[in-house]
């Protein structure tokens, strides 16, 4: 049996053995269970920080940024495996900024050790590594850490939601929850209930302890799954940070010396200022930035600026670079590692 709170308590015990004095407050912060940042609303009823139930199915909160690596689909599959929902019932949303979404796997990934070695470490070691990301709410993506962080955490979220929904159905039917089963987004007994019908009541019944499914029963994990973001990215309906628009928002495009490290002697912004939408050309010292009312105008304006670039302090082509490197070698040994014995 396991739960997210138990993992948190484990972190407290590990740190409690090695801290003293003022650092004890840090140990307390590690043991503290982060608040659920989600609230009931139009999106549905949250059962924990990662699972929202609504009439359309289940929305999984993926706290790692989707950058083409497929992490949103992976995290959703971890939840769906325990929650007993059909794949077409699953949606994914990116998590809001919140401590609950700290990335405990980042510290493990930063060790540059193979994942199989990280996975074989004692739980106490993993808890210690997770301490800093939790204290500082490091909700970051990178280092192939998303699955390291979420493999147990997301399954616990799905299992906890499943058992809460069963408890809600059992209360309505006046039976033991152990006699009920879940399948296809429903709790099934003498009477069946959809998850949406039970969500509001289940939100107050999330258990402290849940058992994770045996891998032999997995339907999704370890198998090829259709990516949840495939259709939106194929049809151009996916939204990204660059799609954000705010009242009075401006856009900028930066142009720097194409020779890395090279300076700028001067520039003429006249042509750029004639581009519709361009409002200003800013001298950055070693480059320029064009501010406009939209992205396209900013890009076109930056290309229209006449710039006198200075040369860089390195050779201009590969052949010249190779010549410099070759000239650095000498025929005589000029270093010594050891001189003994």
Question: Residue ranges of each PLM-predicted region?
Answer:
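Structural alpha/beta core scaffold segments of enzyme domains
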Residues: 1-341
């Amino acid at each position: 049996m396991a739960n997210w709170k138990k993992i948190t308590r484990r972190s407290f015990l590990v740190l409690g053995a090695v801290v003293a004095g003022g650092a004890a407050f840090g140990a307390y912060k590690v043991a503290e269970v982060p608040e659920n940042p989600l609230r009931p609303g139009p999106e549905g009823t949250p059962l924990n920080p990662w699972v929202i139930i609504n009439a359309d199915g289940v929305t999984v909160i993926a706290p790692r940024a989707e950058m083409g690596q497929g992490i949103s689909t992976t995290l959703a599959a971890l939840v769906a495996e325990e929650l007993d929902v059909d794949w077409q019932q699953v949606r994914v949303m990116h998590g809001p900024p919140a401590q609950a979404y700290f990335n405990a796997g980042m510290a493990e990934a930063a060790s540059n050790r193979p994942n199989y070695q990280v996975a074989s470490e004692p739980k106490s070691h993993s808890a210690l590594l997770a301490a800093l990301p939790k204290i500082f709410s490091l909700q970051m993506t990178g280092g192939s850490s998303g699955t390291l962080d979420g493999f147990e955490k997301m399954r616990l979220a799905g299992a906890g939601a499943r058992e809460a929904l069963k408890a809600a159905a059992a209360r309505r039917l006046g039976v033991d929850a152990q006699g009920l089963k879940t399948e296809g987004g429903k709790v099934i007994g003498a009477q069946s209930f959809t998850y949406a019908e039970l969500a509001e009541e289940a939100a107050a019944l999330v258990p402290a302890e849940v058992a994770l499914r045996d891998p032999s029963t997995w339907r999704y994990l370890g198998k090829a799954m259709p990516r949840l973001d495939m259709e939106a990215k194929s049809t151009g309906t996916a939204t990204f940070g660059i799609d954000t628009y705010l009242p009075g928002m401006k856009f900028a495009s930066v142009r720097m010396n194409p020779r890395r490290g090279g300076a700028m002697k001067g520039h003429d912004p006249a042509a750029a200022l004639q581009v519709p939408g361009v409002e200003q050309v800013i001298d950055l010292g070693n480059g320029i930035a064009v501010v406009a009312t939209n992205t396209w105008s900013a890009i076109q304006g930056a290309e229209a600026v006449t710039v006198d670039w200075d040369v860089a302090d390195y050779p201009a082509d590969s052949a010249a670079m190779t010549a410099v490197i070759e000239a650095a070698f000498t025929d005589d040994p000029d270093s010594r590692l050891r001189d003994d014995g």
